[in-house]
Amino acid sequence: MLKEELLPGRGSCLRRNNSEWLAVTINCESRSDIMIINDTSLTNKCAQQWTFNIAPRKYYMIVNIGKNLLTIKYNNNISEHEIIYDPYIYENSEKKKINPDDLVKKYSIPDGYIDILSKWYSIKFIYPKYNIIFIKPEMGISIQVHTLRSEKWEILSGKPIVISDNRVYYFVEKGTKFTNEKMKFHSIINPNKSPKTFVAIKEQWSGSFDEEDIKRVYNPNNYQ
């Protein structure tokens, strides 16, 4: 594949380049907001054309966060590049909420949670001072920012890919901690292929905790 198109609100797969340098050129009819992952860097800007290179064996992804169609051209065929995360792998599947009882049995969920927020791709056990969040295999939460709170994350299991501010961290070990300040990008991706390997994180916050506080910059799970 030498070319692909991204509608507004859509992203490419997160891929790993092969042994050759890859040149990428993005074009659109007028200036538009674009986000790219180039290995460990997350960058966004408003542009009509954007050309960049991906080093051998490095990771890359393109997200259309603007309002115009993006046309992406590659100088090499990317068909054989390893897909680490496909945001739309379950796009046409049944969206069934996660059963909290399944998680409570498998993982030693501490007593004392006061609420549960279950979605089809993640589930959150809400405690008075922290949350425990589980993310299904091959799924990710939205790339988002908060306007009223900052968050601290601790990885509990699953070796996720973590976006924090403008950096991307791959296959993160248990016990690693991140601080996500207000209005800074953050997200978590579960790259595991096994259907039983959930990613789990502990989330704490400072400021005002309100689900309406979330601004989802890229939300692949809200399929249009």
Where are these regions (language model features)?
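Non-cytosolic beta-sheet module surface loops
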Residues: 26-28, 64, 145-147, 190-192
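A short beta-to-alpha transition loop/helix N-cap that caps and shapes the active-site region
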Residues: 208-214
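A generic structured-segment signal
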Residues: 128-135, 140-146, 151-155, 176
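Short acidic-glycine-tyrosine-enriched beta hairpin
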Residues: 36-61, 164-186
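Glycine- and acidic-residue-biased ligand/ion/polar-headgroup-sensing regions
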Residues: 11-48, 137, 147-166
